[in-house]
Amino acid sequence: MALFSSRTGKRPRIVPALDDDALARVLRQVSKRGGGVKSTEVTLVAGFLEETGDNWDRRSHRVSVLAGETAESGSDLASAWLTRSPKDPDALVFHSWVGLMHGLRDRHLEDAGQLVTQCHRAAELSPADPLPWVVLLGMARIERYPQSEVNAIWREATGRDRWHREAYLQMLAHLSPEEGGSSAAVLDFIDVVRARIPANAPCAAIELTAAVRQYQGLVAQGGVRAMTADQLWNGGQIAASLEQAASLWAKPGFFQHAAAQADLNVLAYALCAAGRAVDAHHVFEALQGTVTPWPWDDDGPAVQRFEQHKAKAERGRQGGVRGA
C-alpha cells in the first residue's frame, strides 16, 4: 500500500475513498443520481468487490464507502444488484449496508426483519466473512438489541476478523450515551480491549475515537464543562494514548489498513483539541489534504475546520510555539 508516499501536497478536500485509488475510480464511474441504474454499474461494483477477495479490512472499507455513497445519492444500485443476484452474498451484504445507512440517518430501519434475514443469508453463503455480522451490529444500534444479543453478534464478527475496525466502531457507538448506552459502558469496553489491540491494528484508533467523542460531548454541553473540556487530554490513560499515537501513527508504513487516513484525521483533531497543534503538523503533512467529515464537522464545515487547524499547526511550527 502506497500510504504516505511521494504524493505532493494537495488542497484539503473530502475524499470518501481515502487513498484507495481503485475505489475512487469505481465511485467516479457509478452514477451519482437517483433513479435508474445501468446494468454496467451493477456489473462494475459486483466485479470490484469480487476482486477484493477475502481481505476483510479492505473489503469493509470498500463496501462501507460504496454503500454510504449509494444511500446518500438515492441510487437504486443496491436494489438492482439484489434483484439481479438474490443469492449473491456480496449483493445481500451491500443491500443490507445501504439499508443500515438509511436507518442510521433516519434512526429507524425500514423492514428490519428483511435486512436481518439478508445478513444471516449472506453469512450462510459466505461463512468466513465478518461483514454480515458487522452490519448486524449496526442494526443493533438502531433496534437496541439486548446486550447479550449484541455480545453474541460481536463474537461472531471478531471471531472472523479479530481486529475488524468497523466492528469496533459499531460496538463503540452502540455503547455510547448518545445511543442509549453510558459513559461507563464505553470506558469498560475500552479498558477491556486496550491491552489486547496491537499498536498498528486496523482498530487501533478505537480508544482515541472514544476520547474525541467524549471531548465533543463535553463541548456540546456548554458552560463550565465546555470551558474545561481540554483537561480531558491532560494526564492519565488518554494523555498516554495520545502521546503514543502522535509518535507512531504518521510514520510511513506504520499503518497498513484501508482507513488509516481516517484515523489520522482523528489524531490530528485530538492533538489540536489538546492544544498541541505543533505536534499535529506532521500528521497534517501525512494526510496530504485528505479530510474526513468527522470529527471536523462537529463545530463547522469539515474542510474549513481542517484548513484552520492545519494553518494553526503550520504557524506554530514556524514560530516554534508548542500548542500554538
Go through each PLM region and give its residues.
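Extended alpha-helical scaffolding segments
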Residues: 252-299
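Extreme N-terminal leader/anchor segments
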Residues: 1-76, 80, 84, 281-287, ...
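Alpha-solenoid helical-repeat scaffolds
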Residues: 13-20, 35, 53, 86, ...
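Amphipathic alpha-helical repeat scaffolds of TPR domains
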Residues: 47-66, 86-104, 127-138, 160-177, ...
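Long amphipathic alpha-helical scaffold regions
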Residues: 153-162, 175-198, 295-315
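Structural motif corresponding to the intra-repeat A-B loop/turn of tetratricopeptide repeats
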Residues: 102, 109, 143-144, 180, ...
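Alpha-helical repeat scaffolds
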Residues: 5-8, 40-48, 73-85, 111-123, ...
